[in-house]
């Protein structure tokens, strides 16, 4: 098994800043980290920080260089159990999840994260295409589970994926090289063109958050994106928080509910694999990233976490009635699998943003074998 992830034991100002940076990401969230907070907590000056990293994203890039390759290997190790990591590794794990998730919108971090992820993925692919497909599900579940855990702790039960994937064959009975883009289902997205003023503001807020995160949004940016004045927004929305709340309702509850209802047409596990691929289409990019950013922010915002937890429950209730996996499965297995389906959707989107070609993988093969593995587990 891959050994636990640790920082260098050398004592230096740089190492101290790195450790403090990781701790702040874990406690406050990646978008709340600042030079002042890092320097103050490390007991060092701001010029000392700038001499090492130049910027906060530069710190994230250095953290990734220090432990990223080892952490990726650990994430793709079937024998590893992230939910059982000790205190130090647990903190590093949560921080690395946030860096990987946000890196695509931070050029200075992404220029380090992307090539490291690409090198790791080349190693995964050397084990075969079906192996790569299974790893994408394992790592996707682990990412999605960690992003969701502070919001709904029951998501840790999705770790059943490790056992299920371990029970799958080395090779799939389905052939390599299938065209996975044929006859994909059309999934609902977020309309970007509307004459309704409130809807125009909501769609603009969704777009800004998807590009820059919740903390990167402001009423001025939303107004510019909607091509309206800030003064025209305030009579209809009391604050930016209300805009975000309304955006949340529109993008998460409405779109998720619509797409899960469409999933009723997925009569087999193979159809579910096609739904995953369809969800990675370019037309769904804004929706995917908005959903990711809401999870990233809710990890450190109890009010938002409470609203998102209710949305997760609604989604899971629909999953129970629509998923081809859950027909005839005992109750004790239903809950972990529905959380797995939820976590996988988020984690696969994060891998997609990191440059992994998950949209070109044949998820139907893994989906079919996953269902068979569950059947073997329950006898």
Predicted segment positions?
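Short, amphipathic alpha-helix enriched in basic
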Residues: 10-37, 41, 189-221, 225
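Short amphipathic alpha-helical segment with a characteristic S/N-K-E followed by hydrophobic residues
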Residues: 17, 32, 55-60, 216, ...
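Short, structured motif recognition centered on aromatic/hydrophobic residues
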Residues: 30-33, 93-102, 244, 255, ...
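Short hydrophobic/aromatic patch on the recognition helix
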Residues: 42-53, 226-237
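Hydrophobic alpha-helical connector segments
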Residues: 62, 73-95, 259-288
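Short, basic, alpha-helical segments at the C-terminal edge of helix-turn-helix-like DNA-binding modules
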Residues: 64-71, 248-256
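Amphipathic alpha-helical packing segments from all-alpha helical-bundle domains
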Residues: 107-139, 284-285, 289-292, 302-327, ...
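Hydrophobic/aromatic-rich alpha-helical bundle segments in the mid-to-C-terminal region
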Residues: 110, 114, 128-190, 305, ...
């Amino acid at each position: 098994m891959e050994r636990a992830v640790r920082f260098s034991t050398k004592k230096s100002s740089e190492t101290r800043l790195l450790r403090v940076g990781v701790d702040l990401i874990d406690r406050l969230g990646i978008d709340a980290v600042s030079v002042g907070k890092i320097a103050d907590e490390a007991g060092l000056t701001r010029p000392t920080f700038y001499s090492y990293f130049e910027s906060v994203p530069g710190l994230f890039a250095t953290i990734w260089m220090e432990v990223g390759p080892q952490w990726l290997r650990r994430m793709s190790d079937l024998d590893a159990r992230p939910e059982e990591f000790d205190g130090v590794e647990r903190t590093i794990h949560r921080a690395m999840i946030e860096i990987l998730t946000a890196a695509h919108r931070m050029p200075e971090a992404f220029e380090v994260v992307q090539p490291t992820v690409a090198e790791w993925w080349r190693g995964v692919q050397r084990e075969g295409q079906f192996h790569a497909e299974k790893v994408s599900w394992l790592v996707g579940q682990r990412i999605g589970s960690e992003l969701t855990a502070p919001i709904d702790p029951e998501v840790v039960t999705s770790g059943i994926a490790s056992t299920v994937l371990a029970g799958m064959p080395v090779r799939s009975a389905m052939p390599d090289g299938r065209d996975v883009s044929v006859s994909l289902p059309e999934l609902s997205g977020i309309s970007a063109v509307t004459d309704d003023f409130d809807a125009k503001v909501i769609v603009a807020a969704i777009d800004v958050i998807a590009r820059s995160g919740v903390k990167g949004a402001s009423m001025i940016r939303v107004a510019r994106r909607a091509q309206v004045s800030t003064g025209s927004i305030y009579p209809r929305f009391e604050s930016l928080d209300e805009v975000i709340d309304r955006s949340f309702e529109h993008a998460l509850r409405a779109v998720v509910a619509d797409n899960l209802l469409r999933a009723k047409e997925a009569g087999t596990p193979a159809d579910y694999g096609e739904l995953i691929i369809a969800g990675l289409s370019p037309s769904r990019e804004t929706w995917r990233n908005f959903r990711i950013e809401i999870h990233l922010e809710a990890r450190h915002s109890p009010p938002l976490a409470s609203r998102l937890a209710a949305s997760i429950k609604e989604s899971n209730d629909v999953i129970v009635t629509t998923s081809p996996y859950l027909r005839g499965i005992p109750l004790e297995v239903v809950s972990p699998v529905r959380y797995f389906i939820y976590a996988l959707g988020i984690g696969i989107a994060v891998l997609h943003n990191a440059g992994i070609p998950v949209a070109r993988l044949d998820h139907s093969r893994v989906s079919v074998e996953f269902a068979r593995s569950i059947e073997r587990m329950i006898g």
